[in-house]
């Protein structure tokens, strides 16, 4: 089995499986364009040195989220804002800030991008400001909760908070993809040393997550036939 896995990794079979599933969704009309949701999740790695080499994985790093420290890698999942299907994933060390990788994950025809407060700095990045496409995108990024507070005696509607709730209701689609991989598939910790080896598996897992979402939505017939059923009415 290890030899077979190494063969899959060598030829990037995991990524090819993910790409094939995504392309089939697109050809079936089940994957839309124009809007993208970006998010990242931390996948824990053993911090122990109790292994064959007696050392930690040099590609895994520590990062702080809230008041808690994590050791491992980070996976960015980028989903279609219209359907929730995953169109891109990217892996990196856990200590890489979300905003530094965001622009690499945006499609050429995206004109709206949703994200949490970790991506607040994206519109201000120099490469975004100077890029003809990236600078024209509408970045709908959730603000930090602390910036939405009103005085205790304020009796009106907090419209800013209402807008944030609206953005969050769209952005939560990406959480569904992570939920499938972590809860349904049980992949909460890295299985191998090195980001590339783990990403080979993540490509397969997120590809399967797309299939599962397609099945749950009752769209398997369209997926198999690569065509969308005519709309009623």
Which stretches of residues belong to each language-model region?
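Helix-centered, glycine/charged polyanion-binding patches within enzymatic domains
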Residues: 111-112, 117-200
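Membrane-helix cytosolic exit motif
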Residues: 208-220
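Extended hydrophobic-aromatic, low-complexity segments
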Residues: 101, 150-151, 217
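Intrinsic disorder/low-complexity segments
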Residues: 178, 191-192, 210, 230-233
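Polybasic low-complexity intrinsically disordered regions
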Residues: 1-133, 144, 203-210
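A short, flexible helix-boundary coil/loop motif
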Residues: 217-233
């Amino acid at each position: 089995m290890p030899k077979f896995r190494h063969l899959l990794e060598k030829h990037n079979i995991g990524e090819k499986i993910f790409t094939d599933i995504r392309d089939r969704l697109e050809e079936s009309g089940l994957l839309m364009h124009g809007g993208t949701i970006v998010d990242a999740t931390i996948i824990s790695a053993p911090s122990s040195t109790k292994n064959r080499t007696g050392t930690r994985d040099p590609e895994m790093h520590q990062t702080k989220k809230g008041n808690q420290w994590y050791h491992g890698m980070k996976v960015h999942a980028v989903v279609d804002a219209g359907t929730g299907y995953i169109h891109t994933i990217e892996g990196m060390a856990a200590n890489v800030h979300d905003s530094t990788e965001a622009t690499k994950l945006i499609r050429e025809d995206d004109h709206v991008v949703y994200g949490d407060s970790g991506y607040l700095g994206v519109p201000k990045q120099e490469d975004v400001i100077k890029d003809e496409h990236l600078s024209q995108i509408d970045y709908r990024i959730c603000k930090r909760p602390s910036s939405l507070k009103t005085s205790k005696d304020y009796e009106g509607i907090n419209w800013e908070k209402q807008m944030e709730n609206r953005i969050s209701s769209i952005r939560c689609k990406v959480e569904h993809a992570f939920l499938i991989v972590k809860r349904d598939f049980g992949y909460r910790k890295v299985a191998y040393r090195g980001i590339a080896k783990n990403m080979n598996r993540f490509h397969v897992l997120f590809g399967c997550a797309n299939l599962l979402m397609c099945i749950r939505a009752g769209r398997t017939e369209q997926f198999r036939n690569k065509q969308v059923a005519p709309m009623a009415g």
